[in-house]
């Protein structure tokens, strides 16, 4: 079972309520940085397996 659009909308609404409009851009920025670091780490892991 994947996430449907309604599930994603509910999660975003909960995040908005918890953090408020003022902190939301900072939270999204931190989340994006974390995802980028995770992807970079996965790429490094793949390159070490090939060696």
Curated annotation (Swiss-Prot):
Membrane topology: Single-pass membrane protein
CC terms in the record's Gene Ontology section: TAT protein transport complex
Keyword check for Translocase: no
Cell location: Cell inner membrane
Family annotation (NCBIfam families): PRK01470.1, tatAE
Transmembrane segments: 1-21
Chief localisation class: membrane
One GO BP annotation of this record: protein transport by the Tat complex
UniProt keyword list: Cell inner membrane, Cell membrane, Membrane, Protein transport, Translocation, Transmembrane, Transmembrane helix, Transport
Family listed: Belongs to the TatA/E family.
Pfam families reported in the protein's UniProt record: TatA_B_E (PF02416)
Protein name stated in the entry: Sec-independent protein translocase protein TatA
Primary role: Part of the twin-arginine translocation (Tat) system that transports large folded proteins containing a characteristic twin-arginine motif in their signal peptide across membranes. TatA could form the protein-conducting channel of the Tat system.
Record text on subunit structure and interactions: The Tat system comprises two distinct complexes: a TatABC complex, containing multiple copies of TatA, TatB and TatC subunits, and a separate TatA complex, containing only TatA subunits. Substrates initially bind to the TatABC complex, which probably triggers association of the separate TatA complex to form the active translocon.
Source species, domain of life: Bacteria
Listed GO MF terms: protein transmembrane transporter activity
